[in-house]
Regions:
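RNase H-like nuclease module associated with reverse transcription
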Residues: 439-442, 448, 577-707
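Reverse-transcribing Pol proteins
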Residues: 43, 52, 56-249, 253, ...
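C-terminal reverse transcriptase regions that engage the nucleic-acid substrate
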Residues: 394-510
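Catalytic palm active-site di-aspartate
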Residues: 283-287, 319-321, 343-362, 394-404, ...
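Catalytic-core region of right-hand nucleic acid polymerases
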Residues: 166-330, 420-468
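Polymerase palm active-site segment centered on the conserved acidic dipeptide of motif C
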Residues: 254-258, 347-349, 357-429, 440-443, ...
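A short, polar/acidic, helix/strand-boundary loop motif
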Residues: 310-335, 538-569, 577, 596-609
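Active-site palm subdomain of RNA-directed nucleic acid polymerases
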Residues: 326-371, 574-592
Length: 707
């Protein structure tokens, strides 16, 4: 069934009703450009993965699903206006807060103190709760006590309140019914004050910022924002100086990384007597996030915003839009992390208001209860959004920060929602036209994030970052380089192909924990050749296993910009030989005098495009053999004289090396690998790159199968 309206479409392509305000799904059904993209990608997948069973019809269904997911989150101003349904403030809307202001003798600071004292009795962060739940030796005990009085809006010493409101923003005026309705909801919850504008204008020390609005994925109403950065007259509350003051007051924010989350899960796995079968993951949300904090009464006069209809709003609890809020709330997050981990049997990490936990199955109930008790004990009885608490008992997997972690199989991948949005983003960009810097940064961010579980595509990120490097105006559009176009094409191909082949992007959780190295690759390169020695580590000692001198079969004409890439190719050749000799699932330390190539090898992150061919080859080798670089050692050039000589054409025999340790210079596999790494060969067209990539995969596949 399809129901259309003047402002949007309800479409049900996959037996579910999807809100399609931007007409994305309808566009796909009617737009030849989308259909053409599907056909092109299907053909390229067939070339790149000849054994794949991908067909246009199956590909189309995945793209439609991506469009459907994007449509669900593709709300716009009109969507918010429809949600507001013509809302206007009740005639007496300011009466409650005006009466409270009268009780405070017209003093906004006193008014805030009175209302905060009343709210404390309802159960919020307070000095009594801190003393009752947090030990005095906690590193953030004093900071937490300061927060009980509220977050201070820190400003430079020369800051002066502007005393009059800026002009209403055009976007706010367009969606004012939605913004006002959301502020009204906050008013009913006791989170903001609504007062007559004329009363605030008569007060001294009032600072005005702009009410603003933005979209929010999955929320038709969007999100109302206190824009503390907008004041064309100068003196905005958000500033680099204010951010620095916040860091000095609250400390640096250190959010958990995916490696930290996986490490937590692995530690529970090691506690389990039944492997993954006895590991359970769970999550819990704090309700309201920043609104769980008060604004310090002395700072409340700085948070006024003019609305329509003679009404103005003043924040007296935490808000979205202030550069100070994340740092202040992180104090609470840090304390909760320590307190919860001290009482539960498993372990948790926390990202702002998202608590993520891991434990054994029999510990789940008690850990959830203990976690809840800590949160409500510190922040009040309503601090936990109980309806959002979930675990893996029923499904075996859970979404943590956009990652789908499956403890039934012990794997991690992109969450379904994030996968579809990334797929939509890469498909939606029109590579034949100029592309906004903002869009390029989003694509680069997706590529960087998701290459964590799709190792083969890690070389396909640097060109996207390079496109927007140094550009501050995110709304500027630019013509894409050939390398960036290839990157976008390859991400389209892999996102689709990996999904349709069944497993999608998945990585074993246990691969995040790396063992001590089994081999050391010592290397050096010149612009004319490569030298490396491979040592096997046995009982803590390095034993020379192989040594090689390889001539470059291409001429770089002495151009020094190729030096880093040549150094890196030595690492590729050494790994190629290890894999050719049947080594699998081993870890390696790389040692050399070139910092850049050491960094590329250990981080699998690359800068520039000269190394792309070599990077594709190495990542293909490592992925196929389950091998990893786990350490890097930088040595001085004078300590690397053997490999330096080897790279300049001196043969191992001339240095006193004979027999089996010497790698045959006519090794055909290494010669073919070197040919594919050639930095002079470019693949600026997608067909060329697909052929190159397919050739790399065939060569690596054959080498792995033979040994």
């Amino acid at each position: 069934m399809v129901i259309t309206s003047a402002t949007g479409h309800y479409l049900d392509p996959e037996a579910r009703q999807v809100w399609d305000p931007g007409g994305l799904l309808k566009d796909f059904q009617q737009n030849a450009k989308w259909e053409n993209k599907v056909r092109i990608v299907a053909a390229q997948i067939a070339e790149l993965f000849p054994d794949s069973s991908v067909h246009v019809e199956r590909l189309g269904s995945v793209v439609r699903a991506a469009l459907g997911e994007a449509a669900d989150g593709n709300y716009n101003e009109q969507s918010a206006i429809e949600w507001a349904a013509g809302f206007s403030f009740p005639a007496n809307i300011c009466e409650r807060d005006s009466n409270l202001l009268d009780l405070a003798d017209g003093d906004l600071v006193v008014m805030a103190k009175l209302s905060h004292e009343a709210r404390e009795n309802e159960g919020r962060l307070s000095t009594a709760r801190v003393h009752a739940t947090v030990p005095r030796d906690d590193p953030d005990f004093e900071k937490l006590l300061i927060l009980c009085d509220g977050v201070q809006i820190l400003v430079p010493k020369d800051f002066t309140p502007n005393t009059t409101p800026p002009l209403l923003r055009n976007k706010y005026k367009r969606v004012c019914t939605a913004v006002n309705k959301m502020f009204f909801e906050g008013y009913l919850e006791g989170l903001v004050y609504l007062l007559p504008t004329h009363r605030l204008l008569s007060m001294s020390g009032i600072h005005w910022s702009s009410a603003h609005w933005t979209t929010k994925a999955g929320k038709q109403k969007g999100r109302n924002i206190g824009d503390l950065s907008n004041d064309e007259r100068g003196g905005a509350l958000n500033s680099p100086e204010a951010k620095l003051l916040g860091q000095e007051a609250w400390g640096d924010i250190k959010h958990p990384t995916v490696d930290m989350l996986v490490g937590m899960v692995i530690r529970q796995y090691k506690r389990s007597a039944n492997g993954w079968a006895d590991v359970v993951l769970w999550k819990m949300d704090l309700k309201g996030a920043f609104t769980l904090m008060f604004i310090h009464p002395e700072s409340v006069p700085l948070l006024a915003m003019q609305l329509t209809g003679g009404v103005s709003m003043v924040y007296h609890t935490g808000l979205f839009g202030s550069t100070l809020m994340p740092g202040a709330f992180d104090v609470i997050s840090r304390v909760l992390r320590r307190r919860i981990n001290s009482v539960i049997k498993g372990e948790i990490e926390i990202f702002v208001d998202d608590i993520m936990g891991a434990c054994l199955t029999g510990e789940l109930s008690s850990d959830l209860k203990d976690c809840t008790d800590v949160c409500t004990g510190l922040l009040g009885p309503n601090a936990v959004a109980v309806e959002k608490t979930g675990d893996t008992l029923a499904t075996g997997h859970i979404d943590w920060l956009g990652w789908d972690i499956n403890v039934t199989k012990g794997i991690i991948g992109i969450s379904r929602k994030n996968f579809l949005r990334a797929l939509y983003g890469f498909f939606d960009v029109d590579i034949s036209k100029k592309v906004k810097v903002r869009t390029l940064q989003k694509l680069a961010s997706w590529a960087s994030r998701y290459s964590l579980v799709c190792r083969a595509l890690r070389p396909m990120t640097s060109a996207l970052y390079a496109e927007s490097s140094g550009m501050r105006n995110l709304e500027v559009s630019k013509t894409l380089s050939g390398e960036a176009v290839v990157c976008i094409h390859m991400w389209r191909l892999f996102l689709v192909a990996m999904e349709l082949e069944g497993e999608g992007y998945r990585r074993s959780l246990l691969t995040f924990e790396l063992e001590s190295p089994s081999f050391v690759i010592e290397y050096d390169s010149s612009l004319t050749g490569f030298g490396f020695r491979i040592f096997r580590i046995e009982y803590g000692s390095e034993l020379l296993w192989r040594i090689a001198s390889v001539d470059a079969d291409f001429s770089l004409r002495g151009v020094s910009s190729y030096q880093n890439t040549m150094e890196y190719i030595s690492v590729v050749l050494a790994f190629g030989y290890l894999i050719q000799q049947g080594e699998r699932s081993k870890t390696v330390c790389v040692r050399g005098d070139n910092v850049t190539s050491l960094k590329w090898a250990t981080t699998e992150r690359f800068k520039g495009t000269l190394c792309t061919n070599a990077a594709v080859c190495l990542l293909a080798l490592l992925s196929a053999s389950s091998m990893d670089v786990v350490d890097a050692t930088h040595i001085r050039g004078v300590e690397n004289c053997v490999c330096d000589d080897l790279s300049r054409g001196v043969r191992p025999e001339a240095l006193g090396y004979y027999g089996d340790v010497v790698i045959n210079g006519s090794n055909s596999f290494l010669k073919n690998l070197l040919m594919l790494c050639n930095p002079l060969t470019t693949h600026s067209m997608i067909k060329e790159f697909c052929r190159f990539y397919a050739e790399v995969q065939r060569m690596v596949h054959d080498a792995v199968l033979r040994n």
